Amino acid sequence: MLLIPAIDLRNGLCVRLLQGESDKETVYSNDPAAMAVTFEEAGAKRLHLVDLDGAFQGEGANISSIRSILKNVSIPVQIGGGLRTEEDIDIMLALGVSAVIVGTMAVKHSDVLEKLLKKYTGEQIILGIDSRNRKVSIEGWKESTEIQDVKFALRWKNSGIKRVVFTDISRDGMLSGPNLAALREMAEHTGLKIVASGGISSIDDLEQLKNS
């Protein structure tokens, strides 16, 4: 199991939101690059970035912060949030991120994602599944669908996806522990590599994930 620190970016700051609510924000740092370096120095082997401005508005406001992070760390960096066009993906991968996470695109622009999975590898394109009551949410969690999360993962596995970042929205930012049952079902039914996101706050949570 690999522990991946996450940095949520909003207006160039490191923040945390409660259940993705934009008005429930806590700012942790005004220097994302320094935060990334701190994580690497602590032993992180990979970083996960979320562009919240991109997720909420469809266009990012954190490109300078992302560039600075990439310049200052030597470990792989993956990013998600607002990546909804082929150009968005091309730009991020050209910047030097190791992988991009797509969610809304997989629902609304499946033809574009199919094309990208032929252009790049299944390790460079990661499927982001944001789940509320086991149904996929998109557009920065503002829009709900009737798509069941496991079926969604299986559909994209058939197109070449190898890895899923699974977020239980009800747990995100709450420090209440991950949804182990949902994560176990996702792993067992799909055979994909699963990144557990949302609610993880303690060594005990990590031990449970490792043993589940």
Residue ranges and their predicted role:
Residues D8, F39, L47, I79, ...:
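Conserved, mostly hydrophobic/aromatic
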Residues M1-L3, G43-R46, V73-V77, V97-S98, ...:
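Short, well-ordered coil/turn segments that N-cap beta-strands
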Residues L13-G60:
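N-terminal beta-alpha supersecondary unit
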Residues G12-V15, Q19-D23, L93, V97-D172:
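Conserved anion-binding
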Residues Y28-E40, R84-D90, S144-R155, L206:
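Short, acidic/polar
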